[in-house]
A protein has these predicted regions:
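N-terminal Rossmann-like dinucleotide-binding module
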Residues: 1-47
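Predominantly a Rossmann-like dinucleotide-binding segment in NAD(P)-dependent oxidoreductases
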Residues: 12, 117, 125-241, 370
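Beta-strand-loop-alpha-helix segment that lines the small-molecule cofactor/substrate pocket
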Residues: 62, 66-67, 73-74, 78-126, ...
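Short, Asp-centered acidic motifs that coordinate Mg2+ and/or phosphate
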Residues: 30, 67, 148
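Conserved SAM-binding strand-loop segment of SAM-dependent methyltransferases
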Residues: 50-55
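Active-site loop of classical SDR/Rossmann-like NAD(P)-dependent oxidoreductases
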Residues: 34-37, 318-332, 348-355
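C-terminal helix-rich "cap/oligomerization" subdomain common to oxidoreductases
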Residues: 67-69, 258, 293, 303, ...
């Protein structure tokens, strides 16, 4: 399996490493990236590709690839996907698939022309043990009709400090924090509910990583705790509390789905004891879990009895790496899909990724306009492409 990459950052380096662990014949033969931040990790793992090209066109023109991995900054994804589709190459694109609504409609046009079979997406939570167990509970009707959900994704201060310094701090590059970081979660809960969001509302802003909150430092102390993740790269800066970022550092959203279910969602990027928790309440039972702490339980509504109890391991437990172990599970399924020529069904596709992205964008529109946003016209437009 011959692989090329456009954007060889730390994420794509780790994705390739996981694929290589599963399939020793997978070989990344070339990449395009003027500043390959994933190089250090790749060299340590002895997987750094030997050929570097100046452009994607040049690489696609000179190499016969079985897979193109797209790990470039979000606003570049559309251009790189288009070139991959036109070259008839199978694509793995990191989330979010594109960076704004205009790009979403352009991608829809591309998919209408070229088909969606050649695009695989990195919405990794769908591959997690939590997702697999929840799908089983739902298919067995243990939870009944999903009534309401509450969920959160919080990250540690050092991770928030990374967002304040990395290119992701600029909405023009990333599409915003809700899109960049939380489209995973929005997709996951749409999967659980089995319905599209129809109305969204949101509040949020930047109140933690601001100059007035710079910690008072004792002698010998410094702000390095906020720079623990120091793999920065393109367009990065050093400032954390005085960052020129235009993204939020906290946000809440409310979502109503077409089938009547509701979700309240909360994200904050300065949480020292981070968690990624959810409670799913149905007509017959409830499930609650935490990706970070690793647990998933379910209870019967009528009897109160626990009907499911599993601990998949803490995210900080030794050996539990890569999105709570889901990276390895994702790459195993994708490898099977590639080897079996798309006969292996995957739990998520490019249309799911587009929908999650659109919801994130509308959540931010609500935050910026101080209005509840109805999504019906948006879904009508997407459906008109018959994807």
């Amino acid at each position: 399996m011959k692989i090329g990459a456009v954007g060889f950052g730390n994420r794509i380096a780790h994705v390739y490493f996981e694929l290589k662990e599963i399939n020793k014949d997978a070989q990344m033969i070339a990449f395009v990236d003027p500043l390959p931040i994933g190089k250090k990790f790749a060299i340590e793992k002895n997987i750094f590709p030997s050929k570097q090209y100046n452009s994607l066109e040049e690489m696609l023109g000179k190499e016969e690839l079985d897979l193109l991995m797209i790990g470039s900054p979000n606003h570049m994804h559309l251009e790189h996907i288009q070139k991959g589709l036109e070259a008839n190459v199978k694509i793995f694109a990191e989330k979010p698939i594109v960076a704004n609504e205009e790009q979403t409609w352009k991608l829809a046009e591309l998919i209408k022309k070229h088909g969606k079979e050649n695009i695989l997406v990195g919405l990794v939570l769908r591959y997690s043990k939590h997702a697999r167990s929840l799908r089983k509970l739902i298919s067995e009707d243990k939870l009944g009709e999903i009534i309401s959900l509450e969920a959160s994704e919080h990250i540690m201060p050092w991770h928030g400090g990374f967002f304040m310094r990395n290119w992701r701090r600029k909405t023009s590059y990333s599409g915003g924090f809700m899109l960049e970081k939380c489209c995973h979660d929005l997709d996951f809960y749409s999967m659980v509910v089995g319905s599209r969001p129809i109305r969204v509302g949101s509040f949020g802003g930047r109140r933690s990583f601001v100059p007035e909150n710079i910690p008072e430092l004792s002698k010998g102390d410094n702000l390095d705790v906020y720079k623990e993740y120091n793999i920065l790269g393109w367009e990065s800066k050093e400032e954390v509390f005085e960052s020129d970022a235009d993204i939020v550092d906290h946000q809440v959203a409310i979502v109503e789905y077409e089938n009547g279910a509701t979700l309240s969602f909360h994200t904050n990027m300065k949480v020292p004891d981070e968690f990624r928790r959810f409670a799913i309440i149905g007509s017959k039972g409830m499930a609650e879990g935490d990706f970070v702490r690793g647990f998933l339980t379910a209870h019967d509504s009528h009897t109160g009895k626990k009907i499911f109890d599993e601990n998949f391991g803490s995210a900080f437990q030794q050996g539990t790496k890569g999105h709570y172990g889901a990276d390895r599970m994702m790459l195993k399924d994708i490898n099977d899909n590639l080897i079996n020529n798309s006969k292996q069904t995957l739990p998520v596709g490019v249309l799911d990724c587009m929908e999650a992205g659109l919801v994130a964008m509308k959540i931010d529109e609500s935050r910026l306009t101080n209005q509840i946003i109805n999504l019906k016209n948006m879904w009508d437009k997407l459906d008109s492409y018959n994807l």
